[in-house]
A protein has these predicted regions:
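Short, flexible, mixed-charge acidic loops at enzyme active sites
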Residues: 73-80, 125-131
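Non-heme Fe(II)/2-oxoglutarate
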Residues: 80-81, 118
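A C-terminal cap/extension of S-adenosyl-L-methionine-dependent methyltransferases
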Residues: 111-164
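Short, hinge-like loop/turn segments at secondary-structure boundaries
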Residues: 8-12, 81-84, 129-131
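Short hydrophobic/aromatic-enriched beta-strand-loop microsegments
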Residues: 12-15, 84-86, 111-113
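Conserved SAM-binding loop
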Residues: 1-77, 93-105, 150-162
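Conserved acetyl-CoA-binding loop of GNAT-fold acetyltransferases
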Residues: 108
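Acceptor-substrate binding/catalytic loop of class I
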Residues: 82-97
């Protein structure tokens, strides 16, 4: 928080969410953009979080977040291990292909989904061959991961289309 205030000169607070009172903290009730970078998976009650984000955004405002992906190579190749090895404070794992259906219920329209967190070393073929990151096989798998959107994390950008 200190860095954001002193170096970037953005007003910021450390507060509980979704209980924050933005009128008290910032002097305004709605924003053009709300972001949550690797935060959303830590909320137990996603409904109250998405409801609050809708409340905080102006019409046509942008909600952008990143989170682990349940459609990445780790989840697809090692499903049991993926969930067992997920941190205990992760309460949701997003499937990018279903994001629009979920977010629509909370007044959002998905504008863009970006597959991130590409790790060729997590692909079974790379694990078996133990090839180096400079090998042709590695580079092909890395490209395939990006083309097929098999990153282990995802960024989702959506627009508020209606109030709840």
């Amino acid at each position: 928080i200190d860095y954001v205030k002193t170096k970037l000169h953005f007003p910021s607070v450390c507060s509980a969410f979704p209980q924050i009172d933005c009128a008290q903290e910032f002097g305004i009730t709605q924003f053009d953009v709300v972001t949550m970078w690797y935060v959303i998976e830590h909320f137990q009650d996603l409904k109250s979080v998405l409801t609050k984000v809708n409340e905080l955004l102006k019409k046509d405002g942008i909600f952008a977040f990143s989170t682990p992906s349940a459609e990445g190579v780790s989840a697809k190749s090692y499903k049991e291990n993926f969930f067992e090895n997920s941190p205990s404070d992760h309460f949701s794992v997003w499937e990018p292909s279903k994001a629009n259906v979920i977010l629509k219920k909370f007044g959002f329209q998905v504008e863009k989904i970006v597959s991130t967190g590409h790790h060729p070393e997590r692909f079974p073929s790379i694990k078996k061959s133990n090839c180096s990151s400079s090998s042709l096989q590695w580079k092909i798998v890395e490209k395939l991961s990006k083309v097929k959107q098999l990153g282990d994390t995802v960024e989702i950008y959506c627009r508020k289309i209606r109030d709840l």
